[in-house]
Regions:
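Conserved phosphate- and dinucleotide-binding cores of soluble alpha/beta proteins
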Residues: 97-98, 103-266
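N-terminal active-site beta-alpha-beta segment that forms phosphate/nucleotide-binding
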Residues: 1-129
Length: 266
């Protein structure tokens, strides 16, 4: 989605060639404003579609709050609107009590620092989970549904997202918990056949060995000289994804035909 936005602005910049500088700036600002509004509307639509599917899939309201697990941050801090995954959470919370488990998302703590902050600010009940506790909490029956975002979705429905997402999906499938992905259509990559074709970023393993690696005084949490591996993303197979929610509608497994249909919409 970020690449799409950059390319859109580059196209607008090239199209404005030959115009006076002030006019070019105004045209680019107008294009950025349109993009912002479209993203805001897309987030709201994803929220509606996702909340409707979850309500229909889970049936009658539970005795207590609907318990949603999410991983990393896919909210207002990552979009111009209410977010993708958190847009679904917010839409759910508008109609029923919701309690959220936010995976902490080591080593940069996007879940603890960003997702938890967003939800608490909105008055939505949120509890931070250590990443390693997600499967256990899912197995305990405390999670009604998992909702995550996506960085890239292959044509067959394989989903690349923050590392740890795959483990959440596996636990959900093992214990009968719906696993939902929310992402704009620009995240769907028809030119990428499967998740095997998605390159995974491997970051400096030292980031895993430090507490608050981006802080001013990071603290080592491992013996000196011991290495670490840090793939920043993983790929969840399409077969583990119950629904992929976009602003144009959603796809349910198997996803190849459903995603092609969504991409073909105007």
């Amino acid at each position: 989605n970020l690449r799409f936005g950059v390319e859109r602005m580059r196209t607008a910049f090239r199209a404005s060639a030959g115009r006076p500088p002030a006019e070019r700036v105004a045209l680019l600002e107008a294009e950025a404003a349109r993009f912002e509004e479209e993203d805001r509307e897309a987030c709201a639509a994803m929220g509606r579609h996702g909340a409707a599917w979850i309500a229909a899939h889970l049936g009658a309201d539970p005795a207590g709050p609907l318990r949603v697990l999410t991983h990393c941050n896919a909210g207002a801090l990552a979009t111009t609107g209410v977010g993708t995954a958190l847009g679904v959470v917010r839409a759910l919370a508008a109609g029923r009590p919701v309690a959220v488990f936010a995976d902490e998302t080591r080593p940069f703590w996007q879940g603890a620092r960003l997702t938890a902050w967003e939800l608490a600010k909105d008055g939505i009940d949120v509890t931070i989970l250590p990443d390693v506790a997600a499967a256990s909490v899912i197995a305990s029956g405390k999670v009604s549904v998992a909702v995550v975002g996506a960085d890239r979705i292959a044509a067959n429905g394989d989903v690349a997202n923050k590392v740890g997402t795959y483990g959440v999906a596996l636990a959900c499938r093992a214990h009968g918990v719906p696993f939902v992905v929310a992402a704009p259509r620009t995240t769907l990559d028809s030119a990428c056949p499967t998740g095997r074709d998605i390159p995974i970023e491997w970051r400096d393993g030292a980031e895993v060995l430090l507490l608050d690696p981006a802080g001013e005084s990071p603290l080592s949490v491992a013996p000196a000289g011991v290495p670490a591996l840090y793939p920043a993303f993983d790929v969840t197979p399409a077969a583990l994804v119950d629904a992929i929610v976009t602003e144009a509608g959603l796809s349910t497994a198997p996803h190849a035909d459903g995603l092609a249909r969504l991409l073909a919409l105007p």
